[in-house]
Amino acid sequence: MGNKPTISVSHLGCEKNRIDSEHMLGILAQQGYSIDANEELADYVIVNTCSFIQEAREESVRTLVELAEANKKIIISGCMAQHFQEQLLEELPEAVALVGTGDYQKIAEVIQRVETGERVTEVSQNPTFVADEMTPRYRTTNEAVAYLRVAEGCDYRCAFCIIPHLRGNQRSRSIESIVTEAQQLADQGVQEIILISQITTNYGLDLYGEPKLAELLRALGKVDIPWIRIHYAYPTGLTPKVIDAIRDTPNILPYLDLPLQHSHPAILKAMNRPWQGQVNDNIIERLKQSIPNAILRTTFIVGFPGETEEHFEHLINFVQRHEFDHVGVFTFSPEEETPAYQMPNQVPSEIAQARRNYLMEIQQPIAAKKNQKCVGQTVEVLIEQENPTTQEYIGRSIRFAPEVDGVVYVEGEGQLNSIIPVKITDADVYDLYGKVI
């Protein structure tokens, strides 16, 4: 056991990738490999790459090149390995193995083969694997927070997206499997779990013949975890049944992450999104009526091929009309394997960037107003960090998801990884400030 090499993992990309990294670490730790966060001390560095858009690929390439220059033995896993496969081995002699998105469960076997001198390619052309509660996992988030994947892959074919090509079709886990893992996390002291998949509202469709998110939420309501947050909720899947489950289940937070991407019907149709513009209006109004304290986050893509000033104006009005709590804006990234790459009327990047900046400017006063409404309120805050210099704590209220939203700066006595009452005394565009009650 002591002779096994030391492994480090460089995690890039989204939280779905993070879970893959955590499973690889768990499998290796269980099999007696030493894990070290310091890449300099590792015999092998697994780089779990992202290939969603050009910017993500560039970050992955930079990381790979830096490790290659340091003469590290590199195992490339994740979406770039799935995307480019043998091309990566040709361009990076230091890479000793490729592991696809549906093959990370074989990581220990891959390293054993590499140790015999083999240069390994372990990439399934159509990924089918989905980890469950039996797959070892070594969490890399703070003690109080964990991501919980309810399904892998995607059945939609949006015109700008290569995710189905990289991760395969949707494969849902059973309700029993997810609840069992949630209970395991509760037993580890986790205070918040974040449900993720490519389309969380489509959960169960492939397994049960119909979406089962409402049933899953009610089952998770029986697990002793204070906060359960839903990411990637498609508006068309927010049926009255799902909305009722969110409203009626105390530990399901009234926080919804809605990847709308645009508001104009013509752009949504060109994007091949599974709804049209007017549906967004109706669903968002219904959400606000059914869950008056709903916290809504969304993302938009600007500069999609064919987007005119009129289309963009429609989006501006939509954002102003609905006053989302949190908005992320991305410029369109042309991906070669997608229909959008070949579309006419490509928008110049400088125009797309200007539209992104303008939309973010429109959102800022809305976000500030939403945060300002919290001043004077006492809210529950999950304490995640302590600043040893100022004795100040940093945490999040239910308004804020990890990494993508703001934080709460807290004065007073608190305990890490616990949820405590905090009176909000001040706010800015992104963050809140308060004192322990």
From Swiss-Prot:
Its cofactor is [4Fe-4S] cluster. Its main location: cytoplasm. The keyword Iron-sulfur applies. GO terms for molecular function: 4 iron, 4 sulfur cluster binding; aspartic acid methylthiotransferase activity; metal ion binding; protein methylthiotransferase activity. It catalyses: L-aspartate(89)-[ribosomal protein uS12]-hydrogen + (sulfur carrier)-SH + AH2 + 2 S-adenosyl-L-methionine = 3-methylsulfanyl-L-aspartate(89)-[ribosomal protein uS12]-hydrogen + (sulfur carrier)-H + 5'-deoxyadenosine + L-methionine + A + S-adenosyl-L-homocysteine + 2 H(+). It is found in: Cytoplasm. [4Fe-4S] cluster 2 binds at residues 154, 158, 161. This is Ribosomal protein uS12 methylthiotransferase RimO. It comes from Crocosphaera subtropica (strain ATCC 51142 / BH68) (Cyanothece sp. (strain ATCC 51142)). The gene is rimO.
